[in-house]
Amino acid sequence: MAQNAVSELINFAELMRMSLDYACRHYERTPSGMIHPNVLAINVAKFHWASNYHAMVRHLHDVSGGLVITVPLEADLRNEESGKYLRKYLKSVPGAEPETRMRIYNLIRDLTADAYGGWQFVVALQAGGGLNAQRIMMHRTYPMADAKAKALAAAGVKG
């Protein structure tokens, strides 16, 4: 169902935005004074991105349909003969012009279904060392002792 796919896309976008916002607001400082985003938050965000990017592209393609790869050229729309048919068959809701729809389909294709899209499919997963690299960094940077102490305190156990 399209509404579910759109909800998944919203969820993904907002979790990414919130993760990156958190990483910047909770920046870290090196001994020399240089500031950088929170390492744990960045690795959690990267893990979320890499784990879910492919499913988000699938949702986008599901909502968009086959026109992502079959939409005619804008030159065909401007052609006197073919343009009248394209305007007729690419018509949807009032206010959604065929040229606008075509440009959106072209953008989706460019970002997800052509050479760049294929490259991005690999990079989304492998940039930064892949999922295992993010797992390692999360384990290295998560304040496990603090979490354990809080859990014990919540359970009424003296640590």
What are these regions (language model features)?
Residues 3-8, 36-43:
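Short, charged, amphipathic alpha-helical segments
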Residues 21, 28, 32, 42-45, ...:
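Polyanion-binding and phosphate-handling cores
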Residues 1-28:
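Extended amphipathic alpha-helical segments enriched in small hydrophobics
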Residues 40-159:
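Alpha-helix capping/hinge segments and adjacent helical runs
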